[in-house]
Structure formats: C-alpha cells, structure tokens
C-alpha cells in the first residue's frame, strides 16, 4: 500500500527544504502540493470569504481528499494546477502515477480529520513568524507577481489570523515537530536516520 508523508506549517516555514531533505533518503516519490487545490477566485465560496486564501474553505477539500485517497489506493490522479498570478485553476492538469511513497505538503493538510487519517507520517515545521513573513514576501513578489503593499495587507488582514486560528493548532496532530524548519540540521538528521531505518525494514517504508 502507498504510504503518505504529510508536511505542514505556516506559509514560508520551510516545507520545501524539508521535502528536499527527504528526497536524499527516498529517491522516488511524488509530491502533491495543497496549493494546487485552491478554488478559483470567481467561485461562490470566494465571494463569501472575500478572497481569504488563509481559510480552510479556500481549498477544494473534497477533491483534495478524493485524490489522496486514490493515491493511497495506488490509483492515478489528474492533479489540478493553480495560477497564482490570475488566481484561478488552469485548464490543464498533471497526471500523477502513485509511487510507494507520496509526499503531500500544504498549510492546512492537517485541518480535516479525514485527510489526517490518510497520512502515515505527519510533520509540522515550526518557524518564527518574522522569518516566515520575510520568506513569504520574497516568494510572492518574485514568483507570484505581488506588490509589497498587497503582501503586507494580506498578512495583516488574513494570513496572521489564519495561522493562529487554523494552522498552529494542528501541531497537536504531528508525529514530529521540527523547529526552525530546513535550518535545523539536527532534526533533519534524526528524520533522515528514521526514514533510512524504516527503509531497511520495509521495501515501501513504514
């Protein structure tokens, strides 16, 4: 059976760095980003939320769960792609063929119990707010066509509140909490050693 590793934490916490570290231990896996499951801005729910990207209802949670469940059952999916510049889902999708290990990352992947129940190893990246904000600012301006003013406004109006309301409380579900994210060499070493040990004991880990 396919095993799923879930990596969560606030925006800019260093989830991608941890994924890269895992890739040194598990050479073959598919990566599912929850970001691709954002609803398009034109959806009814977004009008209700006033385009709040930091609320669980901003995601197509039913499709996200359906796809993870299919991957868990070793079935292929067609993952959506999200356009962050135009804030809508692209017309094309990506065919994802499951591998023995699937890594899923996103800010709210531990919020729903049905999704948590599909994840075999839950990792929470705990990084200071100021560091996360700086990383988010750099990313959104360089890769998502955002202005400095718009990123700051979003952070103050929804992102900060959304983190404390929805994301941070999910730490209690984590099997492993990594402070400082990808810069915590000792924690990443422990994680890598753990995965290597499991790999020696099982052909599919876990």
Curated annotation (Swiss-Prot):
Pfam families in alphabetical order: PRK (PF00485)
UniProtKB keywords: ATP-binding, Cytoplasm, Kinase, Nucleotide-binding, Transferase
GO molecular function: ATP binding; cytidine kinase activity; uridine kinase activity
BP terms from Gene Ontology: CTP salvage; UMP salvage
Cited SUPFAM superfamilies: P-loop containing nucleoside triphosphate hydrolases
Pathway the protein takes part in: Pyrimidine metabolism; CTP biosynthesis via salvage pathway; CTP from cytidine: step 1/3; Pyrimidine metabolism; UMP biosynthesis via salvage pathway; UMP from uridine: step 1/1
Predominant localisation class: cytoplasm
Gene3D superfamilies from the UniProt entry: P-loop containing nucleotide triphosphate hydrolases (3.40.50.300)
Location in or out of the cell: Cytoplasm
One Gene Ontology cellular component annotation held by this UniProt entry: cytoplasm
Enzyme Commission number(s): 2.7.1.48
Stored InterPro entries: P-loop_NTPase (IPR027417), PRK/URK (IPR006083), Uridine_kinase (IPR026008), Uridine_kinase-like (IPR000764)
Domain of life where this protein originates: Bacteria
NCBIfam families (alphabetical): PRK05480.1 (NF004018), udk (TIGR00235)
Entry-linked HAMAP family: Uridine_kinase
Name this polypeptide is given: Uridine kinase
Protein source organism: Borrelia turicatae (strain 91E135)
Species classification: Bacteria, Pseudomonadati, Spirochaetota, Spirochaetia, Spirochaetales
